[in-house]
């Protein structure tokens, strides 16, 4: 953060309305974490993690989780809360995140909800009721998944709910099964269960991004740094803790590819290159999700005075 940004933060922070949640969103490698720390200092805030993979203990290098020093004294909530064997639950995350937000607000501070997992952010900020589950139906669908594979079930989902199919990867069997379960239970599309646009909290959202060529370059540099920092060794350690059996954590970018290398399915060079390619594909999907939300004000993370610009967005919107 520049001296100009720091001065702007000190001047602007006091104008934030009480009870407002600040969202900092955007694609992987765009600069959300650094901006959130600077904003937290300017606004007397605390960060609530909304990155689905940073919820897992030990997934540090591959998720670019900030170190204690990089957090610069800013409290961070909902990091390292689950073992790598725990399946992700948006409903459980919603409960934990709202409890953290409420606690921060009760202490008169500003919650900053920060991450690139769009559904997690919306589940906190908006009114979202989770459909129930049926163990018998779930067991049947999971048996079909094991027999026919995710691609076949994805085609079935495409026939009954094309919008959901467009937002779920053909290889993500767990989410495909859940979507089909909701369709059968409710008789309505899975997308009908997405958060209602009505707000749960008063909020203002800032998105950070930069042009594709520069972001692609950042991604390549980030993956190079991950390898240099010991991603392979970290994945080996996590494999001993059951990472490969973790239905969610095993799909984390970088870890998924290194697990395939450790299993002999890829060379290390292939795992490295595939991590870059997979991250770039993931960024395209993140952009598609976030760009549909007109409430997000987008800023160029490569621009000068980013923190001051973000505060100029936050201040009037939060009054």
Curated annotation (Swiss-Prot):
Asked if Nucleotide-binding is a keyword of the record, the answer is yes
Q: Which Pfam families match?
A: IPPT (PF01715)
Tell me the first and last residues of the signal peptide. Answer: none
> Which molecular-function annotations from GO does this UniProt entry contain?
ATP binding; tRNA dimethylallyltransferase activity
Q: What reaction gets catalysed by this protein?
A: adenosine(37) in tRNA + dimethylallyl diphosphate = N(6)-dimethylallyladenosine(37) in tRNA + diphosphate
The record lists substrate as bound by 28-33
Q: Which GO terms describe its biological process?
A: tRNA modification
Report the EC code(s) recorded for this entry: 2.5.1.75
What role does this protein play?
Catalyzes the transfer of a dimethylallyl group onto the adenine at position 37 in tRNAs that read codons beginning with uridine, leading to the formation of N6-(dimethylallyl)adenosine (i(6)A).
**Entry's family note:** Belongs to the IPP transferase family.
Task: Report what the protein is called.
Answer: tRNA dimethylallyltransferase
Q: What's the name of its gene?
A: miaA
